[in-house]
Amino acid sequence: MKSILLLVSFVFIAFSYCEESDVNQIDHVDMGKFSPEEVKFRYLEINGIKMRLAEMGNGPLVLLAHGWPESWYSWRHQLVGLSKAGFRVIAPDMRGYGGTDAPSEVNQYDINHLTADMIGILDALGEKTASIVGHDWGAPVATYSALFYPERFTKLVIMSVPYNGRQDQNPIEGMKAVFQDNFFYILYHNEPDGVAEKEYDKDPRDLISKFYQSPGSQTKSPKITDPKRSAGGFLPRIGEPEGLPDWFTPKDLDYVVGQFEESGFRGGVNYYRNIERNWKLTKDLKDHKIKVPTLFIAGSRDMVIGGASKEMLQSSMKEAIPLLEEVILFPNIGHWVQQEAPEETNKILISFLNESN
């Protein structure tokens, strides 16, 4: 199990700068059962790119950073729940996603730029501090933002991707040693010539409908069962789902698919192409610790944690995060924790965010 957690830490390995910007435009989005007027978009010039932010509420700022393949929309339930609890909630389309710009250069997606985007949001909104919550790829972005700017980020919530400090081994080399000539999606994302995004861009609906499933969802047999990379790409290795889970409606699917039909997948895949670069950029950080109150949340059946228990996760993270207050594992919940268990997630978040430091 320790090797699984170390492999997870390989994936996400920060220091940066940002530009202050003005609000250019505000519009609204129809969220079905949520009133359209409840959610507004802001378009801000931040750190050299235009970013789209979904915003709700007034009060202390909470910044929500999504992962792959997601958008601001993955936080739709938290926007409503946290804003009603008295928080100003911002959920950006991260760099390369949705309505946010997608620079062409791969190194524009390294951890320096990603954390600079988070600081840039605070500066553009005139906010001195915020709590930051990150899921999937948003977890390391949130983690490193809090690691380098504890005076700006007063609380940290890590979702799905544990943090146990910088590892000694080059993460990409570690994955190559483990998987060799077998398929592994992170190595696939690091292949040259954009092979991964070319596959995904052909059919965004196929990817999203296959990924956004619950543990135990019924699927047909995958078209590719050979573990060798030479047997093919990613999507044929995932069985066709029999339907959508209750927490992800056809309208949700249409919205998320539309975001990727518009932006493409290259921006999100470029995060993975910076894993080795991020590891090199953070070479002097081995002994740095996160010094803000921190909470970890995941589904007990999230494949990222590989079946790790609450105690194992606490033990693996406590040295790098001395102020880790609690590890929360929701039973029988998978990777998309804030969407699969929105009420439970909101309850835990609100309680943690309301605590005095």
Which residues make up each language-model segment?
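Glycine-rich phosphate-binding loop signature in dinucleotide/nucleotide-binding domains
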Residues: 57, 125-128, 356
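Flexible "cap/lid" subdomain of the alpha/beta-hydrolase fold that forms the substrate-access gate
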Residues: 25-39, 50-51, 97-133, 137-325
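The conserved SAM/SAH-binding core of class I Rossmann-like methyltransferase domains
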Residues: 63, 90-92, 135, 159, ...
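Short acidic-hydrophobic surface loop/beta-edge motif
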Residues: 40-46
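Catalytic active-site module of serine/aspartate enzymes centered on a nucleophile-bearing elbow/loop
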Residues: 323-357
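Sec-dependent signal peptide recognition
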Residues: 2-7
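Conserved HGGG/HGGXW glycine-rich cap/lid loop of the alpha/beta-hydrolase fold
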Residues: 49-101
